[in-house]
């Protein structure tokens, strides 16, 4: 439950979901929704499927008819597209009207003729809403039937001819109906076709990303840029390019037959539209590289898939001279060769390429990744469960919002419909994902649709997002909460609303799920052939851009700002607020150890004589029976875990504003966090922030230096840097070795323990001799400039 007075905590709810009512309650819930929709509240809709019409009369003098259909229910109406000169039109459009906003008991389906000035009335069908049948899944879809068109007075003829017939399917269903995603909803009917497309619920899938490993080994018989017959005299490099990804080798020697042996990793995206362009360049001057040979390689045809980390054979490729990247790419696309540039030269380059499908291509932050599977399907593990998320609604969004939600887990993205013209934001849409690893996170974000005009020029407004880690969920339990939506802006922290979610994880393979806790988080290749952290971050950014570009090309597109917000593209940027939060997390991490040290110090100083006496007794028992030490420690851990079970977290974790230092952040710190890279601020602001960063870094530098000093003092014990101290230490070590050899271990342990726990009257207020000895040891601090 939410803590009193806190506006950023979870609020637990108890909506009447079939999944929470139990079998008996679900049977009495007056719904026949399929089991896949038991995580949302049933919402009834009136569906009107306009299929086609026949034998429509001509209304114009010209004898032409441009028919369209207008579906009216009170003040709501939907209009089909008009078809030119077609007396037997086919529309196949479905309209959905929410029964929660029912304004009339009569449904009118009117056929009209599109005209320049005033559209002509052709005929209509009037149905009583109370007579419309219910058809709720798992029932089969309702079959359409023919209805006779009549005029406004009920007549069936016009100038001696019938008004024709229209085929309709009219039924009352729920959001579980298969027609729901593609239906034209009542609030969206006035929009254009382009604007309407951006309001529908859709499912998207991320493109399949694979690492492409390219080894540039060597080249031979190169010809210089200035003379087409002589070898190059300046150093030569190889440039690797695929799409917007560019890599360069170091200069190779000798220039005519250079050897590089450089290895690069690129991100490839099926169906591999971008070829691999390898260009050998001569460094003719500083900052000026002239191409002396080029090869364009289609990735799909030339790069083998390496599923088992086997050694891939290298190949020699002929280099073409005088061909531009555009010409070569055109040849690859069309499959033809330009005769002028297709001459085979003696120059060759030695390459090794492979598609490393045994890796997982990271396209999101590793801290809240939703997918950890390999690119190769045959190496993937079987699913361990199912994640079901019901996006119920939102509240307190403020303003005139047209919100929609986007949820991302694994490769599957889902987008809810856009709610238009309503203050009661209720989606009640349910989605499912297969779960392969519990150490993953689902992200649900809310946006305000700014592109209802269909132009696509404006960016959709970010309202907030929610992350739920699956490992924190109990199996088969339905969590229903209002999650706070917050926006961090240069002006400060702002609560933008609350998102109502229902979440349930169902385990289908308990043994595999528990065994996963002992397996590596990432696929095996990430550990046997690791990629450096810097390179991995660079590849992750490229993968994010590829996903955003590919999803932006879908129809309707999932906009780039939406994808980048969910993938958290800017999470790697510097933030003083995040730095403070991470520092406090580190301090909090050691708070338990500090508390234990204080408690032990109190024991040694006899602040509580009874507790100290009990510790003496326990210590003597453990010395007499050392075989009980490990069992006592693990029994103590077990008892602590059992004791904490009563106070275990009952709600999933959410974004903590205090932990994030969002409320305490200063305006200038937030302004710096949202600054562009490189900075776009004036020089005096940048200078002030630089000085502040120097001050913080100076304190960090001092702490790091102190830590290094303590370690260096330990190293100097045996280094003879201080010959007297080392001689004393090794002499002491020899004496201790002899004493420990001659004295039983239990006697030594008892004496050492009693000395450590001695009464304060037997203690000196000055530092002990070992402490003083250690403080006097030399370190390397006096060797620094």
PLM regions with names:
Residues 572-609, 649-737, 759-785:
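Multipass alpha-helical transmembrane domains of eukaryotic endomembrane proteins
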Residues 96-104, 265-274, 432-440:
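Short Pro-Gly-centered beta-turn/loop motif in secreted/extracellular proteins
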Residues 589-595, 606-645:
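Core alpha-helical transmembrane segments of integral membrane proteins
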Residues 53-54, 217-222, 392-396, 508, ...:
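Hydrophobic lipid-interacting interfaces of membrane-associated proteins
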């Amino acid at each position: 439950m939410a803590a009193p007075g806190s506006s950023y905590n979870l609020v637990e709810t108890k909506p009447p979901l079939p999944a929470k009512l139990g079998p008996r309650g679900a049977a009495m819930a007056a719904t026949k929704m399929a089991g896949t929709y038991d995580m949302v509240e049933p919402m009834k809709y009136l569906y009107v499927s306009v299929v086609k019409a026949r034998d429509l009369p001509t209304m114009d003098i010209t004898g032409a008819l441009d028919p369209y259909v207008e579906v009216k229910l009170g003040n709501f109406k939907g209009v089909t597209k008009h078809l030119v000169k077609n007396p037997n039109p086919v529309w196949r459009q479905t309209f959905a009207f929410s029964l929660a906003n029912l304004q009339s008991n009569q449904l009118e389906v009117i056929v009209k003729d599109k005209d320049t000035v005033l559209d002509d009335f052709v005929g209509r069908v009037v149905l009583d809403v109370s007579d419309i049948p219910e058809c709720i899944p798992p029932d089969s879809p309702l079959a359409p039937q023919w209805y006779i068109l009549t005029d406004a007075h009920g007549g069936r003829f016009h100038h001696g001819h019938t008004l024709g017939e229209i085929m309709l399917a009219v039924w009352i269903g729920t959001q579980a109906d298969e027609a729901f995603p593609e239906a034209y909803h009542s609030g969206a009917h006035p929009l254009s076709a382009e604007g309407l497309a951006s309001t529908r619920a859709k499912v998207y899938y991320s493109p399949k990303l694979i690492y492409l490993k390219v080894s540039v080994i060597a080249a031979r018989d190169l010809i210089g840029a200035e003379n087409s017959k002589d070898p190059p005299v300046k150093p030569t490099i190889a440039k690797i390019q695929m799409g917007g990804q560019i890599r360069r080798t170091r200069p190779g020697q000798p220039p005519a037959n250079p050897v590089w042996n450089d290895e690069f990793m690129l991100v490839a995206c099926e169906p591999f539209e971008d070829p691999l362009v390898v260009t050998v360049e001569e460094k003719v001057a500083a900052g000026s590289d002239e191409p002396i040979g080029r090869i364009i390689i289609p990735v799909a045809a030339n790069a083998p898939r390496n599923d088992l980390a086997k050694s891939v054979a290298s190949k020699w490729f002929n280099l073409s001279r005088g061909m531009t990247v555009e010409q070569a790419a055109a040849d690859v696309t069309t499959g033809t060769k330009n005769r002028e540039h297709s001459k085979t030269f003696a120059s060759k380059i030695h390459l090794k390429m492979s598609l490393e499908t045994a890796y997982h291509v990271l396209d999101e932050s590793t801290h809240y990744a939703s997918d950890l599977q390999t690119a190769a399907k045959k190496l993937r593990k079987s699913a361990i469960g199912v994640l079901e998320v019901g996006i119920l609604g939102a509240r307190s969004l403020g303003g005139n919002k047209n919100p929609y939600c986007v949820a991302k887990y694994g490769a599957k993205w889902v987008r809810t419909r856009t709610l238009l013209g309503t203050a009661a934001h209720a989606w009640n849409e349910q989605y499912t994902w297969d779960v392969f690893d519990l150490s993953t996170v689902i992200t649900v974000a809310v946006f305000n649709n700014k592109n209802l005009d269909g132009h696509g020029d404006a960016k959709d407004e970010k309202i907030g997002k929610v992350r739920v880690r699956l490992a924190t969920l109990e199996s088969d339990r339905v969590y229903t909460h209002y999650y706070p939506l917050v926006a961090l802006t240069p002006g400060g922290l702002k609560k933008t609303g609350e998102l109502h979610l229902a979440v349930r994880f169902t385990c289908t393979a308990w043994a595999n799920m528990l065994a996963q806790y002992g397996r590596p988080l990432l696929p095996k290749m990430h550990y046997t052939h690791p990629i450096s952290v810097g390179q991995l971050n660079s590849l992750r950014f490229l993968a994010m851009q590829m996903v955003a570009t590919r999803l932006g090309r879908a129809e309707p597109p999932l906009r780039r700002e939406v994808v980048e917000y969910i993938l958290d593209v800017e999470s790697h940027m510097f933030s003083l607020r995040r730095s403070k939060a991470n520092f406090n997390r580190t301090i909090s991490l050691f708070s338990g150890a500090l508390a234990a040290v204080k408690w032990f110090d109190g024991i040694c100083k006899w602040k509580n004589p009874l507790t100290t006496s009990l510790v003496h007794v326990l210590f003597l028992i453990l010395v007499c029976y050392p075989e009980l030490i490990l069992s006592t420690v693990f029994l103590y851990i077990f008892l602590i875990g059992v004791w904490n079970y009563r106070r275990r977290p009952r709600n999933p974790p959410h974004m903590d504003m205090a932990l994030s230092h969002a409320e305490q952040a200063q305006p200038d710190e937030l302004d710096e966090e949202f600054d562009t890279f490189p900075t776009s601020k004036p020089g005096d602001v940048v200078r002030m922030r630089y000085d502040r960063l120097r001050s913080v870094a100076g304190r960090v530098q001092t702490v790091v230096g102190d830590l290094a000093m303590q370690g260096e003092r330990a190293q100097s014990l045996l280094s003879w840097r201080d010959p007297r101290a080392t001689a004393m230490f090794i002499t002491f070590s020899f004496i201790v070795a002899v004493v420990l050899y001659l004295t039983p271990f239990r006697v030594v342990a008892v004496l050492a323990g009693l000395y450590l726990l001695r009464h304060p009257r037997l203690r000196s207020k000055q530092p002990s001799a070992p402490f003083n000895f250690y403080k006097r040891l030399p370190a390397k601090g006096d060797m620094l400039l």
